[in-house]
Amino acid sequence: MADRSARRARPGDDSVGQFVIGAEIGKGSFAQVYMGKHKVSGAAVAIKSVELARLNKKLKENLYGEINILKTLRHPHIVALHDCVESATHINLMMEYCELGDLSLFIKKREKLSTNPATHDMARKYPNVPNSGLNEVVIRHFLKQLSSALKFLRESNLVHRDVKPQNLLLLPSPEFREVNKLARPILTASQDSLVPVAGLASLPMLKLADFGFARVLPSTSLAETLCGSPLYMAPEILRYERYDAKADLWSVGTVLFEMIVGRPPFRASNHVELLRKIEAAEDVIKFPRETTISSEMKGLTRALLKRNPVERISFENFFAHPVIISSIPGLVEDDIPKPEASEQRSSSKDTRAASKSDDPIASPRKYSFRRHPTDNDQIRDQFRRVEPPSSAAESAPSRQTSAFSGIAAEARKQAAAEASARTGQSSRNEPGDNLVPRRPQAQPSTSAPSKPGLYEERRRGISNASLNRSNRESSSPTSAALANDSARAPPQQTSRRVQAEEREKAAQDVAFERDYVVVEKKHVEVNAFADEMAANPRLGGQGTPLSPKSGQIVRRATQQGNPTSTTGAIPAAPSRTMQIAQGTQRHYHERGTSLSASPGSTASFITKAIQDASLRLLGIKYPAGLTKGASPPELYNPYPAYPTPSPPVGLISSGKQSTPVDEDARVAQLIEEHATRSDVVYGFAEVKYKQLVPLAPSAEHGLGGTTLEDMPTGEEDVLTVEAIVSLSEEALVLYVKALTLLAKSMDIASLWWARKNRGDQANNALSSTRDSVNTQTLSLRINSAVQWVRSRFNEVLEKAEVVRLRLMDAQKRLPDDHPSHPSNHPQGSESVNGASAEGVFLTVGVTAEKLMYDRALEMSRTAAINEITNEDLAGCEISYVTAIRMLEAVLDNDEDAPKRRLSANMDDSGGDGEDGHAEINADDQQAVQKMIHMIRSRLTSVRSKVRMISNASKAQQQSQPQSLIRRRSGDVTPRSVPSYSS
């Protein structure tokens, strides 16, 4: 415990701020949760301690932004954040304490609820159904409270994105707390934080927790993250698509199904299998025979568990569903509300009334078979008496009138007035300035536009879309007339109209990207495809080792030290340390269960992902070309760009494999060649990166180095601000270039995978046993290459993000009159070379192609000098090969452009012409090709010299042992002794 916080460094000093830390009550992948209490009032809190080592600078900034929002969010069914205290090693979040644990534990231990004093009466009144889930009364109670929290988030333009039973925390019922006044007090964020606005006062109170953190906290690898909560993720998230707020509704459906049945609706060992099961079910949700549940509940569950977001029930219809707004059937007499309670609630001055008029909070009196009318305000006053004085001192009248106006409006509506119930939802576009922002101003991380002006235009478009959507939902005369027409229309016509409206809404959401969030770090197309290949049993899985002779790509050590050093950094975990989302949402009808690209696509989803990464980092969108036509020249022998200790010298293999004889071999060679070129560019970028992050690498950090926060304060004494800007710009463009080459490797692999899945049966019927073995070997080889590309892609993307943040920070520290200072690039202006993104501007002339050309020229000249003097011929060969690969990376696919144009399957779209920043003109192409030809000549010459020297050395070694044998024979054999015999 002593190392948990700087405030607890001394023995016995177990406190953070105004709170004393107790025993550990929970643990997650990135944080530990402790029991705590306030030093003055003794009220209980939950202290979540987040490790700072897992957060880089950007993530910390985003986390603090989320924390500031959470500190102002006040809703009875959302776990409140009291305070945040940062120590030297941790960020400690003081949250509301929920002593009954989470809903998953509640469901798991449902047979033992009668043994807990806080749930004993509930289990007696509403027993669970044998071999099933919870009682329907309890389910409806929890669902009402969850919908109340989601409605509040919806009105505040917030999306939870991680609704699951583990994030639904429970408190003892208000009646239990009223009777047991000696129980431990709980620190509340407001006077009515423990007063439910929906459900029954005799049942446990539900609170939604941990929303928003999933976006800003770093996740673990993709597989580990999906093992945490994939069973509740929407199919669009599992397909690695952009998703809107309707993803929460799918999660609500899975939680509802689990409460009914006692288990999730879909279970699988991995997310790929889970997605296939969801697709195979075809929206048919079956309930076990033992389940005793009403048809209304089944219908709502099926409406929520629609795999197509367009067909899924809308938020408006969900909030207006009879299960949500109607009274709960099957209540015992104690919990049946009085009819007049509805009228009292409508006229109540408290705007935090129950979410629906006919679902009041029951009196705190327990088990009286005759209920006396009790005023709603008196009930709330009785509940407030059990709150600690520290929370009672807080006043929130202004917050109640602003933040909960939508909920109060909804509380005054009846089920029959569904159309008028939407009048209070227009406030969603006008949240309080101190509560939540209208929309987060940060750009989507993987789809940042190349120009700030364009982003501002899109932001205005988003705002207009929100207004249009709210206008449709408001009680304008037009909408009222449409509602009346819908009420009078036949059911089939109404259904068609509703479906058409839903599709129109979805189209507008896509057009304006309203309410869309981008999956970061854990949902990546690159990792999805690699996971699918790794999980395929025909490829042997990730655990199948391959020898270097089979063509497996061996990851070389990351060069972090001096270029002449042989000390490499510890490579990043090959799982999924960094991920990027697909840039364009695809309709689910357009894709099968496979995550590979469609056969006819010239720019697969991986290319779109890398284009979004380029936009995010630089504002550069590279052409989406895919290598086709003849194979590149055979001379490529992959070598690391700089000396490393890992044998063999080659990145992939010796390069002595024969010319490809079939499609699989050609694909394997193309993938490896593109990966090898990317490795050369990556090595060049590492030279820049190691100057920005010069400390020794450590296994504690995923980047093979240290984080920005852990750098020594004296580093700026070594590098000037101008030098940091220059190095950051150069490293950034080189990393993006490496990403494009890696993406092209994935493009080739995805098309091959699609063709292979389509033609397996025919090929298996015609192929011989020998061909099958050869195909299996090549498939394993391609799978190994894909896994290496995925690992390198994640590593490069993360390092590029670090460099981008370093560049932005350095540019802010430049003199105000410096051309690269942000003040000299006001919003709406463009970078001269077009390479700009939000907050990132590159100096004119800084391009990856120019840097690579100059580097290749320098390396070849140095190698030529050494070749003339016969010094380090092996190093000369490495330099020549590296220079050739670097120049080929400059040309990218331009060396076989004429062949591609002759291909009928290749379509040179006009969009590439617009992105001409990544293209080079014809004169430059000829100059680069001429340089490649010259270096190849020198490479042939130096290899001839190496062979001659090797042959001479072998001949000398062969002759040397014979002379040694003759010399040793005379030394060892005894000389003849003259005979004296007669």
UniProtKB/Swiss-Prot annotation:
Mark out the compositionally biased spans (Polar residues).
463-481
The residues that hold ATP are 25-33, 48
Q: Which InterPro entries match?
A: Atg1-like, ATG1-like_MIT2, Atg1-like_tMIT, Kinase-like_dom_sf, Prot_kinase_dom, Protein_kinase_ATP_BS, Ser/Thr_kinase_AS
Statement: the UniProt record of this protein carries the keyword Membrane: yes
Q: Where is the active site?
A: 162
Q: Which UniProt keywords are present, listed alphabetically?
A: ATP-binding, Autophagy, Cytoplasm, Kinase, Membrane, Nucleotide-binding, Protein transport, Serine/threonine-protein kinase, Transferase, Transport
Chain positions covered by the region annotation Disordered = 334-506, 813-834, 898-918, 947-982
The main location class comes to cytoplasm
Q: What Gene Ontology cellular component terms go with this record?
A: Atg1/ULK1 kinase complex; autophagosome membrane; cytosol; phagophore; phagophore assembly site membrane; vacuole-isolation membrane contact site
Tissue expression notes: Uniformly detected in conidia, mycelia and appressoria (at protein level).
Cite the CDD domains for this sequence.
Answer: STKc_ATG1_ULK_like
One example of the protein's molecular function in GO is: protein serine kinase activity
Amino acid composition bias (Basic and acidic residues), ranges on this chain: 335-359, 372-387
EC number of this enzyme:
2.7.11.1
Q: Which biological process annotations from GO are given for this protein?
A: appressorium formation; autophagic cell death; autophagy of mitochondrion; cellular response to nitrogen starvation; cellular response to potassium ion starvation; conidium germination; piecemeal microautophagy of the nucleus; positive regulation of conidium formation
Q: Where is the Protein kinase domain?
A: 19-324
Q: Which reaction does it catalyse?
A: L-seryl-[protein] + ATP = O-phospho-L-seryl-[protein] + ADP + H(+); L-threonyl-[protein] + ATP = O-phospho-L-threonyl-[protein] + ADP + H(+)
UniProt enzyme class: transferase
Q: How does it sit in the membrane?
A: Peripheral membrane protein
Q: Where is the composition biased (Low complexity)?
A: 388-398
**Entry function:** Serine/threonine protein kinase involved in the cytoplasm to vacuole transport (Cvt) and found to be essential in autophagy, where it is required for the formation of autophagosomes. Involved in the clearance of protein aggregates which cannot be efficiently cleared by the proteasome. Required for selective autophagic degradation of the nucleus (nucleophagy) as well as for mitophagy which contributes to regulate mitochondrial quantity and quality by eliminating the mitochondria to a basal level to fulfill cellular energy requirements and preventing excess ROS production.
Q: How does it assemble?
A: Homodimer. Forms a ternary complex with ATG13 and ATG17.
Q: What is this protein called?
A: Serine/threonine-protein kinase ATG1
Organism of provenance: Pyricularia oryzae (strain 70-15 / ATCC MYA-4617 / FGSC 8958) (Rice blast fungus)
Q: What is the lineage of its organism?
A: Eukaryota, Fungi, Dikarya, Ascomycota, Pezizomycotina
